[in-house]
Swiss-Prot record:
GO terms for biological process: intracellular protein transmembrane transport; protein import; protein targeting; protein transport by the Sec complex. Part of the Sec protein translocase complex. Interacts with the SecYEG preprotein conducting channel. Has a central role in coupling the hydrolysis of ATP to the transfer of proteins into and across the cell membrane, serving both as a receptor for the preprotein-SecB complex and as an ATP-driven molecular motor driving the stepwise translocation of polypeptide chains across the membrane. This is Protein translocase subunit SecA. Transmembrane segments: none annotated. Its EC number is 7.4.2.8. May bind 1 zinc ion per subunit. It comes from Buchnera aphidicola subsp. Acyrthosiphon pisum (strain Tuc7). Keywords: ATP-binding, Cell inner membrane, Cell membrane, Cytoplasm, Membrane, Metal-binding, Nucleotide-binding, Protein transport, Translocase, Translocation, Transport, Zinc. One of its GO terms (molecular function) is ATP binding. It catalyses: ATP + H2O + cellular proteinSide 1 = ADP + phosphate + cellular proteinSide 2. The gene is secA. GO terms for cellular component: cell envelope Sec protein transport complex; cytosol; plasma membrane.
């Protein structure tokens, strides 16, 4: 009842929004004839007129109808394609910072040209975000003629590009690129030493294609720039040898099996836990291998790394499967994206898991990496002033889009009515029976000349289906992480009569499957082609198109249900584009991962009670409903994980924003002399008062230790005893001031020897290098804190609040250490070392034209909310 009520509310909200948007569509349509009358030159001149109107105070919403009408007319002239009204609707939704759900084949690429053009008019830049380099290049090449006709520049941002190419791409009005590359460029920009090394401008408007894949599926994977850490490959090899001696606990909660296993597996959360028996066994093995001292516990603080290695090794062996989660190629372990089935070269699992899998597979173990900079996609895309996205499947995730990104989901109606037939699921007892049924369905379609797209959830499953088809000499194409070089070409021709295509987790997403095959791809095979040949190819294509339509269109076969209903809908959505005929059916077994882990015992009990014969399936709405409920459980669990990840990452995100903001101010400043003086004063005072109590005279002061401290840490030989002898009644305030003044004079004398310009250069480089070094260490420390913070729950403490409190304290300590390290280094530097230091770092030296000083009344860098003068700038 509640779900029906909420669905009704959402439906009404969607209809109300569409009603408003349709009024704007009418305005666009009314302008169409006016723009048709304009010459090409008059049409092109509109762009500069729009920009002038924006500079004079009009808003993007004010000029939207005219801008959209202009793009529609330009598209008719450049592409011979007219935007449908539903595409205008989609464009309006995207400009209003919404997620536009547009079904497959509804022309999302053409729709994107509308908001991209409009939002590029203010000169701040538009980033169009795609899932991979191929789609970025394809869409850029496809839409560039239109944008250039309208006087806009288009850039392409790919991973292999040079600094200058990237800079040029980002300076373009519209930039195409992948989510990974935009994110990494942001992180790299916050690691540079001069403004000239940055490639990105201020983040203005992001238009995300396949937004559900990027903002939902990849939300749990942070972008990380890392550097090499110490070599611990031998330890991974030794720990890997322990795993065969450990046995899994079969039924964790059963008294019969109590104490018989060494570890328990939680498949839902992909975690492994040592039992008490396992702990004792592991400790004994580690004692024997001399990796741990006798009498110590694996849980003691100095052995926590060993514990981490053991659990990583167990996860590598028991939870991560070759050809499902990863491939082994060229003596390397390559991650397979669980959502797309594509390989992710260069990506590595963190926390030692990747090294543990390398040890398991007996390939070369690469050093662990230390995080230098990181950010989640959730927090990166929230940096944009405006963000919008489009996909064919967003409605099931509308709550998450709204709660995390504050984006409404608008379901855009199709241009033509959807007539695809979605048949009920067929559920078998075993995997073997299910495979038999799938092969029979494929054979039936071949007889009808009906094309088939088989969707699998892993490389392993796609290869099982492929082997069965090869046994029967059935020609087919396989699209998975192993064979993706011609992915788009294969998927484009998957609509040919009788063609069989197997795709892992919808590889090839972003390319339309046209019934009869893709005519454009067929024509592009020829470099020089006569009009007669074109007509011949078109005639053949029309014949094959009609044959496929009469056979029932593209038939989709799902080999099992995915954890998310949305991924299932993506697979189904490949069929039935633009009113085409089509059909879909999912084949399941009780041995499927989803059914085994998440389906209720009632389904299993019912299946057994029915006493199904071999190769007999159950087809019932009750079963389908139960499966959907299992999927909803997983979706809710995954949403909770992503939400919790964001809540934890928000803590470090505040600190990251503060560090990056101050770092950029440092880089943009001509010099930081005044800031350095403030830091000197602050650091010296905080160290002096440790030896000189407040409101006291010299008889209460620890002068000997103070002089040692000043000499060792700050190379300062202050004549404190001489001052006291001359003026016995010196107060604590006066002596502190005198030491600070002495240090300032000492520093000025040093500056005379080194040279003012050189000193300014050294100050900035030292500040930046020390900040980067400490920030790197802070990220590692916070990561360790995060890994163990859940244990605070056993002490009746809120782990999140404890994490916030401790990470803030760690951040404050880091800032204090930063100031101390900078002052200590600058105090010790001499003229000869200064010259060597500048020569060593001259590639970092850039001059600027403004001076930086942190305002005493501005918010403190640490994020406490206090003014700088009352927090880390206090004197």
């Amino acid at each position: 009842m509640l779900i029906q009520f909420l669905t009704k509310i959402f439906s009404n909200h969607n209809n109300r929004i569409l009603k408003k948007f349709k009024k704007i569509v009418l305005s666009v349509n009314k302008l169409e004839k006016n723009f048709e009358k304009l010459s090409d030159k008059e049409l092109q001149a509109q762009t500069e007129l729009f920009r002038l109107r924006l500079r004079n105070g009009e808003t993007l919403d004010d000029i939207l109808p005219e801008a959209f009408a202009l793009v529609r007319e330009a598209s008719k002239r450049v592409f011979s394609m007219r935007h449908f009204d539903v595409q205008i609707l989609g464009g309006i939704a995207l400009n209003k910072q919404c997620i536009a759900e547009m079904r497959t084949g509804e022309g999302k690429t053409l729709t994107s040209t509308l908001p991209a053009y409009l939002n590029a008019l203010n000169g701040k830049g538009v980033h169009i975000v795609t899932m991979n380099d191929y789609l970025a290049r394809r869409d850029a090449e496809k839409n560039t003629p239109l944008f250039e006709f309208l006087g806009l520049t288009v850039g392409l941002n790919l991973s292999e590009m040079s600094f200058f190419s990237k800079r040029k791409a980002y300076l373009s009005d519209i930039t195409y690129g992948t989510n990974n590359e935009y994110g990494f460029d942001y992180l790299r920009d916050n690691m540079v030493f001069s403004p000239e090394e940055r490639v990105q401008r201020k983040l203005n408007y992001a238009l995300v294609d396949e937004v559900d894949s990027i903002l939902i599926d990849e939300a749990r994977t942070p972008l990380i720039i890392s550097g090499p850490s110490e070599d611990s490959s031998e330890l991974y090899k030794e720990i890997n040898k322990i795993v065969p001696f450990l046995n899994s606990q079969k039924k964790e909660d059963s008294d019969i099996f109590c104490g018989t296993g060494d570890f328990s597996i939680d498949e839902k959360s992909k975690q492994i836990y040592l039992t008490e028996r396992g702990l004792i066994k592991v400790e004994k093995i580690l004692f024997d291998k001399k990796l741990m001292n006798t009498g110590e516990s694996l849980y003691s603080s100095n052995n926590i790394i060993l514990m981490h290695h053991v659990l990583s090794a167990l996860r590598a062996h028991k939870l991560f499967v070759r050809n499902v989660d990863y491939l082994v190629k060229d003596n390397s372990v390559i991650i397979v994206d669980e959502h797309t089935g594509r390989t992710m070269p260069g990506r590595r699992w963190s926390d030692g898991l990747h090294q543990a899998i390398e040890a398991k597979e007996n390939v070369s173990i690469k050093n662990e990496n230390q995080t230098l900079a990181s950010i989640t996609f959730q927090n990166y895309f929230r940096l944009y002033e405006k963000i919008a996205g489009m996909t064919g499947t967003a409605e099931t995730e509308s709550f998450e889009f709204n709660s995390i990104y504050n984006l409404d989901t608008i379901v855009i109606p199709t241009n033509r009515k959807m007539i695809r037939k979605d048949f009920p699921d067929l559920v078998y007892m075993t995997e073997k029976e299910k495979i038999n049924a799938i092969i029979q369905d494929i054979q039936k379609c071949i007889k009808l000349n009906q094309p088939v797209l088989v969707g699998t959830v892993s490389i392993e499953k796609s290869e099982i289906i492929s082997k069965e088809l090869l046994k029967l000499n059935i020609n087919h194409n396989v699209l998975n992480a192993k064979f993706h070089a011609k992915e788009a070409e294969i998927i484009a021709q998957a609509g040919k009569p009788g063609s069989i295509t197997i795709a892992t987790n919808m590889a090839g997403r972003g390319t339309d499957i046209v019934l009869g095959g893709n005519l454009e791809v067929e024509l592009n095979k020829y470099k020089n082609i006569t009009s007669r040949k074109i007509e011949e190819i078109k005639k053949k294509w029309q014949s094959e198109h009609d044959l496929v339509v009469s056979a029932g269109g593209l038939h989709i076969i799902g080999t099992e249900r995915h954890e998310s209903r949305r991924i299932d809908n993506q697979l189904r959505g490949r069929s039935g584009r633009q009113g085409d005929t089509g059909s879909s059916r999912f084949y399941l077994s009780m041995e499927d991962s989803l059914m085994r882990i998440f389906a209720s015992d009632k389904i299993v009990h019912m299946m057994k009670k029915l006493g199904l014969a071999f190769n007999e399936a159950i087809e019932h709405s009750w079963v389908t409903k139960a499966i959907e409920n299992a999927q909803k459980k997983v979706e809710n669990r995954n949403f909770d994980i992503r939400k919790q990840l964001l809540e934890y990452d928000d803590v470090i995100n505040e600190q990251r924003s503060a560090i990056y903001s101050q770092r950029n101010k440092l880089i943009d400043a001509r010099d930081i002399k005044l800031m350095i003086y403030d830091i000197f004063k602050d650091v010296l005072k905080k160290n002096i008062i440790l030896y000189i109590p407040k409101n006291t005279f010299h008889d209460k002061w620890n002068i000997t230790d103070l002089k040692d401290k000043l000499n060792i840490d700050f190379y300062l030989n202050a004549p404190i005893l001489d001052w006291i002898n001359i003026e016995p009644n010196l107060t604590d305030k006066k002596i502190i001031k005198r030491i600070i003044d002495f240090a300032r004079i000492n520093y000025k004398n040093k500056e005379i020897l080194i040279g003012s310009n050189n000193m300014r250069i050294i100050e900035k480089i030292i500040m930046l290098q020390t900040l980067d070094s400490l920030w790197k260490e802070h990220l590692a420390a916070v990561d360790y804190l995060r890994q163990g913070i859940h244990l605070r729950g056993y002490a009746q403490k809120d782990p999140k609040q404890e994490y916030k409190r401790e990470s803030f304290n760690m951040f404050s300590s880091m800032l204090e250490l930063l100031k101390f390290e900078v002052v200590s280094f600058l105090s010790r530097i001499n003229s000869s070392y200064a010259k060597k230091y500048i020569d060593l770092n001259k590639h970092l030296v850039i001059t600027h034209n403004n001076t930086m000083k942190i305002s005493r009344n501005s918010p403190c860098l640490c994020g406490s909310g206090k003014k700088y003068k009352y927090c880390h700038g206090s004197l």
